[in-house]
Amino acid sequence: MATSVLCCLRCCRDGGTGHIPLKEMPAVQLDTQHMGTDVVIVKNGRRICGTGGCLASAPLHQNKSYFEFKIQSTGIWGIGVATQKVNLNQIPLGRDMHSLVMRNDGALYHNNEEKNRLPANSLPQEGDVVGITYDHVELNVYLNGKNMHCPASGIRGTVYPVVYVDDSAILDCQFSEFYHTPPPGFEKILFEQQIF
């Protein structure tokens, strides 16, 4: 009897449930291990400034991913997807086979080739939110929740969200808790363990 009581008390003292706590998945954020040498990341890995590029901390494993960037201050910038082989010190990105980005002028570049372009009257401005969808074939751009019908493709391999800044640009990233509802079928970036 005394053994049962001690066991019960030990269980209550150690948290009471007797269950092993689940490990919480880390949040996707900008990855300070994969950024340019003159990049500054602040706001818990959600804001980029300085000069250069930075990858997000999780690759796009699931079929349809969505993420957003809010333009806090204009300048030179670009957003899209890239492999870990991209040179994050050499901007603008989109000049090689390792990145596919939309630049601040509305042009989408991959392998130094313009793949598409936003209409001239729809260029992102300070305060705008740019959403990106990626389905392992096509990247598409949304401006303040509106599909810009501006697809681009061509990149191969495991890709990560990427952003670069220069000339006083400041961008905030949203990998969850979005400003705008993702398009049907698209969702926040999931870590590989969350998919299976």
UniProtKB/Swiss-Prot annotation:
The keyword Iron does not apply. SUPFAM superfamilies: Concanavalin A-like lectins/glucanases. Keywords: Acetylation. Residues 2-184 form the B30.2/SPRY domain. The keyword Acetylation applies. InterPro entries: B30.2/SPRY (IPR001870), B30.2/SPRY_sf (IPR043136), ConA-like_dom_sf (IPR013320), SPRY_dom (IPR003877), SPRYD7 (IPR035766). It holds the Pfam family SPRY. The modification N-acetylalanine is found at A2. PANTHER family: C13ORF1 PROTEIN-RELATED, SPRY DOMAIN-CONTAINING PROTEIN 7. This is SPRY domain-containing protein 7. It comes from Homo sapiens (Human). The lineage of its organism: Eukaryota, Metazoa, Chordata, Craniata, Vertebrata. The gene is SPRYD7.
